[in-house]
């Protein structure tokens, strides 16, 4: 019964220490406590009026976690007041873990835990107990609920859930500078004993760092820790439960601490003198050497700025910082010349860009070194005496004329001769030549300033000893103008002078232009030609600024006397030889008002001095127009009246009858027929084709053969009808065509001699009636039944 005695002792300690308190008063139950047993009395079925002894009854049991004994762990005992110990009562258990974790003796009510329990897995179990009559299988009491708590033991060590840790702290920090706070957790019950009370300590990392035992805050323990001496620290932290007492469980973690850099070190050159060798042919801007100062700091604290201290040759060189390597790159600012100077010496200063004011007292954060540069001799190309040569030559200069020279020298020791030639790419047309030995430039073509005013080409000089070494220079040649063209008036001027002009008035400003040079390059003079200077009506006033004014010399001008004046103006330039030209200006006399504003320069102004106003002239013109209209109307009516007397009525139109007393064909006649063809029908005419109608067949021109009797008239009419059908000049509408042909071979010479026909009885004119109404007159005239009536002939 050792287990039961230990359990009783534990329960006594719990009660005596006040750790367990009654959860629920049960007035129906009686307290039956044995020093070595845990007993829960089930409520009995008694009268409510029966007086019972009051007391506190447990409704919970306790069981130790992690029990490893050979026998099941005794938990407690259930007992009913109705159980008399006769074996008639059966106890049952249900709820969490009933039958799997906990078992009950049905007869005695003893409860046992049949397996090891873990409080961290499940801290308590809720079960229900009931007493049942064995014989009747009926509950003797209502079901009662109770709790079994798993009693914690110190079986879990503290754990750092966030470990391992990484922290940083600036170098040179003072003692007590905050680094990091660590935290360990214990899975044991923090409300029971010291199983979950953790204490921190440092196992490795002293004396550099310290830790607060309760809070786990890590701080620096030494001042002025230098990153350049040691940058990384690994600190081992321990967390122990039970308040750090003996027997407590412990857990550890690692904290990696890095000292961050501060600018506490100045840059230092590893040596005081740097020697560099530079060829004299090094191009401007090229890097000729590198120097480096060392700064043990890191990042931006190690960024260095280099500067050349003013001194010998300092203006020929420059130094910049390479951001990747923090080296000082020395560059060439001006060309070097071995023949001029062979060595240069200057100092370079290196300093930090980002300073920390806390370390100013440590001294200046910069260092100085000396740089010595030796210039190496290089075989160089010739050097021209000028960077650009400008020359001038007159246009039309004879070919072969020397216009200038260039000079290049070899400045190296033991100089070589120089050869010259023109770069063919710049002077493709070969306007110039150069002497290869002397460098003289001459013309190779006749030059014309008006065509090309300026030439730009290059000359190359090479060493005879090394032709690959060449240099180039630009040549600019300006072609000077020879005064070839005389000046002329720049634009045509339309000059007018008022009739009421006064002497001395400027009526026009003229300017001149010269094709030789721009107007700003010459001075022009203006004057009248000698023949116009005699009793001039106008004169020229030279303003001495390449312009002149036309000035009046008379008091008033009359358009009736002279409407236009022609003024010859002589213009001379100032070049040599002097060129001049005579330009004739036309001056028109106009009518102006009193203010000099031109009112009219038209022809009607000539009539104004007669005394007629403009309104009177308009009235006269209207009258003339009306009279002309009346005359035209009268002539038209007369002609219409003559036409009306030609026919008896408008319906009776004799299309083939015309009057022969007309002296000439009217508009209708000339458009409708060719009078020449009618007068000479025997003339062969070309058959014309109409353009708007495609004829089925073309009629070839032929001469009408002479016909006997009256058949020639019929053939004549058929021939004219056919010609009109194919005539392209015929109008696109029906028109009246008249013919003057009376036939050939007739004995009658006129219409008045129709009665004298001797063979009238032999003539057959009945076919005329078949030709339609247009030939009705002829049919009536030559018909057999109707005699000739002289009253019908007009």
UniProtKB/Swiss-Prot annotation:
The keyword Plastid does not apply. The gene is CDH12. PANTHER family: CADHERIN-12, CADHERIN-23. It comes from Homo sapiens (Human). This is Cadherin-12. It comes from the Eukaryota. GO terms for molecular function: beta-catenin binding; cadherin binding; calcium ion binding. Keywords: Calcium, Cell adhesion, Cell membrane, Cleavage on pair of basic residues, Glycoprotein, Membrane, Metal-binding, Phosphoprotein, Repeat, Signal, Transmembrane, Transmembrane helix. Glycans are attached at residues 256, 456, 537, 545. It is a single-pass type I membrane protein. The lineage of its organism: Eukaryota, Metazoa, Chordata, Craniata, Vertebrata. Residues 55-160, 161-269, 270-384, 385-487, 488-609 form the Cadherin domain. The chain crosses the membrane at residues 610-637.
């Amino acid at each position: 019964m050792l287990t039961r005695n230990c359990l009783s002792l534990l329960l006594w300690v719990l009660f005596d220490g006040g750790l367990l308190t009654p959860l629920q008063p049960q007035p129906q139950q009686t307290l039956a406590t044995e020093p070595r047993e845990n007993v829960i009395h089930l409520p009995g079925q008694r009268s409510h009026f029966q007086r019972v002894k009051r007391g506190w009854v447990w409704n919970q049991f306790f069981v130790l976690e992690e029990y490893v004994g050979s026998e099941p762990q005794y938990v407690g005992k259930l007992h009913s007041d109705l159980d008399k110990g006769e074996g008639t009562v059966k106890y049952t258990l249900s709820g969490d873990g009933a039958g799997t974790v906990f078992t009950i003796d049905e007869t005695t009510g003893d409860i046992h835990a049949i397996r090891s329990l873990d409080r961290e897995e499940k801290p308590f179990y809720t079960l229900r107990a009931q007493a049942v009559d064995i014989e009747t299988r009926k509950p003797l009491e209502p079901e009662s609920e109770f709790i079994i708590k798993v009693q914690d033991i110190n079986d879990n060590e503290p754990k750092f859930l966030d470990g391992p840790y990484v922290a940083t702290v600036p170098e040179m920090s003072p003692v007590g500078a905050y680094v990091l706070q660590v935290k360990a957790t214990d899975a044991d019950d923090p409300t029971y004993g010291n199983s979950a009370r953790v204490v921190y300590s440092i196992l490795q990392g002293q004396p550099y760092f310290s830790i607060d035992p309760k809070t786990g805050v890590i701080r620096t323990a030494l001042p002025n820790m230098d990153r350049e001496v040691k940058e990384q620290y690994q600190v081992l932290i321990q967390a122990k439960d039970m308040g750090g007492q003996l027997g407590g469980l412990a857990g550890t973690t690692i904290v990696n601490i890095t000292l961050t850099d501060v600018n506490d070190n100045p840059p230092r050159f590893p040596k005081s003198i740097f020697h560099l060798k530079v060829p004299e042919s090094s191009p401007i801007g090229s890097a000729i050497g590198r120097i480096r100062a060392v700064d043990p700091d890191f990042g931006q604290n190690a960024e260095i700025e280099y500067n050349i201290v003013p001194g010998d040759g300092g203006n020929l060189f420059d130094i910049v910082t390479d951001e990747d390597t923090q080296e000082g790159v020395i560059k060439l600012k001006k060309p070097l010349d071995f023949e001029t100077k062979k060595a240069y010496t200057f100092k370079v200063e290196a300093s930090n860009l980002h300073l920390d004011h806390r370390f100013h007292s440590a001294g200046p954060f910069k260092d100085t070194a000396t740089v010595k540069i030796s210039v190496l001799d290089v075989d160089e190309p010739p050097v021209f005496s000028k960077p650009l040569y400008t020359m001038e030559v007159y246009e039309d200069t004879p070919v072969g004329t020397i216009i200038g020279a260039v000079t290049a020298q070899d400045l190296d020791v033991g100089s070589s001769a120089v050869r010259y030639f023109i770069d063919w790419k710049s002077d493709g047309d070969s306007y110039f030549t150069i002497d290869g030995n002397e460098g003289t430039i001459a013309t190779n073509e006749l030059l014309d300033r008006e065509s090309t005013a300026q030439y730009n080409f290059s000359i190359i000089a090479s060493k005879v000893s090394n032709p690959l070494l060449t240099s180039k220079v630009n040549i600019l040649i300006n072609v000077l103008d020879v005064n070839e063209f005389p000046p002329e008036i720049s634009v045509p001027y339309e000059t007018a002078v008022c009739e009421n002009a006064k002497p001395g008035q400027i009526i026009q400003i003229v300017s001149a232009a010269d094709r030789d040079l721009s107007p700003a390059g010459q001075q022009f003079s203006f004057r009248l030609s000698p023949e116009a200077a005699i009793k001039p009506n106008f004169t020229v006033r030279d303003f001495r600024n390449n312009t002149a004014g036309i000035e009046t010399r008379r008091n008033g001008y009359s358009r009736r006397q002279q409407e236009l004046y022609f003024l010859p103006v002589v213009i001379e330039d100032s070049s040599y030889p002097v060129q001049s030209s005579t330009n004739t200006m036309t001056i028109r006399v106009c009518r102006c008002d009193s203010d000099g504003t031109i009112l009219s320069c038209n022809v009607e102004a000539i009539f104004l001095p007669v005394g007629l106003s403009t309104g009177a002239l308009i009235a006269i013109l209207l009258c003339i127009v009306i009279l002309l209209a009346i005359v035209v109307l009268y002539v038209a009516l007369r002609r219409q009246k003559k036409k009306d007397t030609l026919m008896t009525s408008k319906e009776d139109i004799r299309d083939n009858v015309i009057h022969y007393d007309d002296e000439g064909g009217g508009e209708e006649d000339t458009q409708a027929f060719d009078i020449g063809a009618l007068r000479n029908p025997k003339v062969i005419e070309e058959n014309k084709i109409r353009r708007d109608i495609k004829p089925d067949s073309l009629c070839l021109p032929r001469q009408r053969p002479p016909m006997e009797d009256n058949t020639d008239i019929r053939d004549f009419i058929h021939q004219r009808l056919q010609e009109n059908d194919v005539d392209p000049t015929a109008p696109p509408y029906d028109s009246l065509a008249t013919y003057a042909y009376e036939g050939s071979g007739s004995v009658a010479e006129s219409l008045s001699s129709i009665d004298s026909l001797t063979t009238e009885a032999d003539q057959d004119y009945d076919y005329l009636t078949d030709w339609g109404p247009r030939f009705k007159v002829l049919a009536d005239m030559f018909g057999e039944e109707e005699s000739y009536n002289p009253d019908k002939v007009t």
